[in-house]
Amino acid sequence: MNKVHFALFLLVLTVLAVSGFPSENAPTGGCPLSDNVCSSYCKKNKFGNEGKCHGTICKCSIK
């Protein structure tokens, strides 16, 4: 029965990972820790010249 329980556990984890955690809520560019890390993330990936954290999301802008 242990193999069956393990298989069910993996199935539940897979379903939760796919549907339960939308990617827009994931931390990006060092947020919420530092606006400086967010700014370098934007410059490095050529998303803009400046970056600012809005919660856990790094927002890049061109100024």
From Swiss-Prot:
It is found in: Secreted. Its main location: secreted. The keyword rRNA-binding does not apply. Keywords: Disulfide bond, Ion channel impairing toxin, Neurotoxin, Potassium channel impairing toxin, Secreted, Signal, Toxin, Voltage-gated potassium channel impairing toxin. Expressed by the venom gland. One of its GO terms (molecular function) is potassium channel regulator activity. PROSITE patterns: BSPN_CSAB. GO terms for cellular component: extracellular region. InterPro entries: Long_scorpion_toxin_alpha/beta. Negative results: shows only a weak inhibition on Kv1.1/KCNA1 (20.85% inhibition when tested with 1 uM of toxin) and Kv1.2/KCNA2 (7.23% inhibition, same conditions). This is Potassium channel toxin Sp4.
